[in-house]
């Protein structure tokens, strides 16, 4: 028998369900972000919900073609063999997410990981508890537990999860925590993606409209409580 529980068609179906669930629960998401970050609805829409919706629609549109086996050129040393690029999942993926964009930075990596056929656990930040609860409700209502789930908790839960063996770890957050995760991952040679915080420098030269540049820098620096 063929297992269709995690087929490309099933993943696309789940993404469409996720999109519908987000639309249905939009007011609840806004309230959670307001509670955790005091975000205005318009900012929450632009910086969180809109980006997630666009990511889902992109994968729904492109996943079938991205998942296909592709013929690629190879070395003359392998003649007369044929060479193919075959997309395969890593396996079990851990996603640890920050408090500053708690909705968007949880779901966008989830979408990519699920699209590739992985099983995913999200550990959201305990500093955004209302959004964390909404995330758990959304994910649990859409995905089978063996495909994706959310585990809430403080740093001790993150430590417990990091002590387990994973096939891939995705982390967004501080450089300090990133170093800890890199060290943990290295013990099992686990591949990782670390999106770490920085100072967001901006270079301004003499040929610019200084008033316009100043407004743009201030806007970029102070959006989302300066967490961009």
Model-predicted regions and their roles:
Residues 11, 56, 117, 148, ...:
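Residue-level signal for inorganic ion chemistry
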Residues 72-80, 150-153, 216-217:
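Short gly/ser/thr-rich secondary-structure transition/capping motifs
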Residues 75-143, 189, 211:
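Conserved small-residue-rich beta-alpha loop and adjacent elements
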Residues 82-84, 150-167:
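A structured beta-alpha segment of the ubiquitous adenosine-cofactor-binding alpha/beta core
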Residues 118, 123-125, 152, 172-173, ...:
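Short beta->alpha connector loops at strand-helix junctions that form conserved
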Residues 144-150:
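A glycine-rich helix N-cap at a beta->alpha junction
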Residues 176-228:
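ALDH superfamily catalytic-core signature
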């Amino acid at each position: 028998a063929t297992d269709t529980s995690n087929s490309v068609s099933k993943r696309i179906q789940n993404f469409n369900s996720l999109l519908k669930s987000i639309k249905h629960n939009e007011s609840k998401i806004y309230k959670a972000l307001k509670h955790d970050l005091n975000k205005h609805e318009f900012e929450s829409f632009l910086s969180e919900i809109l980006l997630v919706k666009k990511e889902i629609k992109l994968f729904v549109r492109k996943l079938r073609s991205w998942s296909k086996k592709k013929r690629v050129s190879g070395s003359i040393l392998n003649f007369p063999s044929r060479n193919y690029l075959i997309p395969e999942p890593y396996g079990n993926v851990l996603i640890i997410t920050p408090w500053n964009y708690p909705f968007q930075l949880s779901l966008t990596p989830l979408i990519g990981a699920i699209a590739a056929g992985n099983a995913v656990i999200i550990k959201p930040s305990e500093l955004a508890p209302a959004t964390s609860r909404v995330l758990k409700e959304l994910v649990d209502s859409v995905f089978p537990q063996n495909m994706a789930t959310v585990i809430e908790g403080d740093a001790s839960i993150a430590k417990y999860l990091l002590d387990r063996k994973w096939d891939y770890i995705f982390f967004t957050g501080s450089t300090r925590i990133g170093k800890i995760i890199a060290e943990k991952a290295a013990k099992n040679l686990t591949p990782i993606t670390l999106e770490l915080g920085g100072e967001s420098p901006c270079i301004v030269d003499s040929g610019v409209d200084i008033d316009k540049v100043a407004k743009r820098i201030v806007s970029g620096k102070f959006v989302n409580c300066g967490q961009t």
